């Protein structure tokens, strides 16, 4: 099944130390900043990332942020999922995501359920991911 790309994300997680070391503490949170891009939406993102280490070595994730869209408008994003350590300080990222937009021109995001697939470099804090459309919430169309 071919998925529709909503946008690409490039973040910098503001890590105080190596992510592998941080996850040994079981729970971490840190600010993040970055950008999203796509022909339909482009902007800067500021948010917070939370991770909770699980006994199986994965970490549950929760992130919330504000996208300041080029040309005006604010979009709140809320994502949750997990990361799994792969190798060489790299973490595979899988999340679900929803949005809430402040302007009518961006209201199409309010109806979209998405999935995030990407990776985090645990040594640099760089996050690269693609956000794909999974479904449209029907109740928002009524």
What name fits each language-model region?
Residues 1-142:
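Beta-strand-enriched cores of mature, soluble protein domains
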């Amino acid at each position: 099944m071919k998925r529709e790309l909503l946008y690409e994300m490039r973040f910098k997680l503001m890590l105080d130390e190596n992510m592998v070391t941080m996850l040994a503490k079981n729970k971490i949170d840190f600010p993040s900043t970055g950008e999203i891009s796509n022909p339909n939406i482009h902007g800067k993102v500021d948010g917070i990332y939370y991770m909770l280490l699980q006994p199986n070595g994965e970490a549950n994730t929760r992130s919330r942020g504000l996208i300041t869209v080029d040309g005006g408008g604010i979009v709140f994003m809320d994502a949750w999922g997990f990361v799994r350590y792969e190798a060489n300080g790299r973490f595979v990222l899988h999340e679900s995501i929803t949005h809430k937009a402040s302007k009518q021109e961006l209201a199409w995001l309010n109806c979209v359920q998405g999935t995030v697939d990407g990776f985090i470099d645990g040594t640099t804090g760089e996050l690269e991911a693609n956000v794909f459309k999974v479904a449209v919430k029907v109740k928002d169309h009524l």
